[in-house]
């Protein structure tokens, strides 16, 4: 219980807006409000994107993100069947967020691009059916085989 209290205290100390950027600094943005959810995605596409075992995604309201700079776009059909459009820096290639055009009210911010990364504490792990065997999800954190 003390660990949960510590996380809640840390999250309440975060001041919005939080600034973020791509690797080269061409794209800058501000997150104006707390995310709706923070998830760790273990799908193979996110493993390739992050070049790691999973990618951290913050589900945010679209109107809570203000972007400076011109983003490029890439599109694909996700394994879940959802449309997955990616916005990224055309210079360094760093992904900033994903979105589904059928759900324009929310976007999936690649939250490791934030300057203050204290919010990167996943509330759930998704696509664990594709998880790396060596990675152990912390006890008590909800997990889903695919997209909940």
What are these regions (language model features)?
Residues 2-148:
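A short Gly-Trp-Pro
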